[in-house]
């Protein structure tokens, strides 16, 4: 199972760290994903859901 929100589609994104000399080094930003039990097709299942989806009420825990 990929680390991706099943509701909003949020996932890890890539970019650069920049030093004072503007040198670039690769880094990643992880989405705030929580593993929760929700109803999927009427059955409880553990999936990754973003914290924003939980706070906004787009998904309800079981």
Swiss-Prot record:
Subunit structure: Part of the 50S ribosomal subunit.
Domain of life where this protein originates: Bacteria
Gene Ontology biological process terms, A to Z: translation
GO cellular component: ribonucleoprotein complex; ribosome
Similarity remark: Belongs to the bacterial ribosomal protein bL28 family.
Protein keywords: Ribonucleoprotein, Ribosomal protein
Protein name stated in the entry: Large ribosomal subunit protein bL28
GO molecular function: structural constituent of ribosome
Keyword RNA-binding recorded: no
């Amino acid at each position: 199972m990929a680390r991706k929100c099943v509701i909003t589609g949020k996932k890890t994104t890539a970019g650069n760290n920049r030093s004072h000399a503007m040198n670039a080094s690769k880094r990643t930003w992880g989405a705030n994903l929580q593993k929760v039990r929700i109803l999927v097709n009427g059955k409880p299942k553990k999936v990754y859901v973003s914290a924003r989806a939980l706070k906004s009420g787009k998904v309800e825990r079981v």
